[in-house]
Amino acid sequence: LPAEDEFAEYEQLQASIGSTKKALRILDANANIEDLEIAANRRKDDLLVYFALGLFDRRAKYSEMPNSLQRDIKVFFRTYQSALAEGRESLFSIASPEVIAVACQSASAILPSSVHDESDQLTFHQKYLELLPPVLRIYVGCASQLFGDLEEVDLIKIHIRSGKVSFMGYDDFETSPLPTLTQRIKVKLRDQDV
């Protein structure tokens, strides 16, 4: 449920209905709240990616985190330790080609545009990165730890079996009917090499 500082109409809602819990019960009884459930699932996925990739940095103390993040941890993971454990488990799961293959199959079904060779690779536009299942976002996130900023990248290719990610940049990708490849960087996750 959203907290007081998470939406502008909180006081108006409180005056007319009473509480966010009561408002949610009314919505649940009278409307389809599927969009709320989808948003909650997306937020949990975002947090999972955050905690998995956060293992590469110094771990922040729970007490130093913003209140909104503390609330989300309580809602989606119950405890900070559980959030860290799920993040760690998700990070380690990217070592399995089977996990990556299943996630690529799932991603190819939901991405607006992609090329998927089931035995070998999934290629997609960088702007669709946030639409990927969490395990693939973590996979690409690990590669970007070695590669750097993805700002100049147009296409990303996930190599399913070999533990590699390719980042490709093109001249005039968005406007040219046949853009020229200007950069292709292949990150070998298993060797931690670019």
Per-region residue spans from a language model:
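Basic, alpha-helical nucleic-acid-binding regions used in initiation and control of genome expression
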Residues: 1-194
